[in-house]
Amino acid sequence: AQVESVCPGVVSC
């Protein structure tokens, strides 16, 4: 899973 400036939501930040 790729993490950008804002988390997509599906991944736990």
UniProtKB/Swiss-Prot annotation:
Cofactor: heme b; Ca(2+)
Subcellular location per the Swiss-Prot or TrEMBL entry: Secreted; Secreted, Cell wall
Keyword Ubl conjugation tagged: no
GO molecular function, one term: lactoperoxidase activity
Keywords: Calcium, Cell wall, Heme, Hydrogen peroxide, Iron, Metal-binding, Oxidoreductase, Peroxidase, Secreted
Main location group: secreted
EC number: 1.11.1.7
Superkingdom of origin: Eukaryota
Catalysis: reaction(s): 2 a phenolic donor + H2O2 = 2 a phenolic radical donor + 2 H2O
An annotated GO BP: hydrogen peroxide catabolic process
Keyword Secreted listed: yes
Cofactor comment: Binds 1 heme b (iron(II)-protoporphyrin IX) group per subunit. Binds 2 calcium ions per subunit.
This protein's GO CC annotations: extracellular region
Function of the protein: Removal of H(2)O(2), oxidation of toxic reductants, biosynthesis and degradation of lignin, suberization, auxin catabolism, response to environmental stresses such as wounding, pathogen attack and oxidative stress. These functions might be dependent on each isozyme/isoform in each plant tissue.
Similarity-based family: Belongs to the peroxidase family. Classical plant (class III) peroxidase subfamily.
Full protein name: Peroxidase 6
Species this chain originates from: Cycas revoluta (Sago palm)
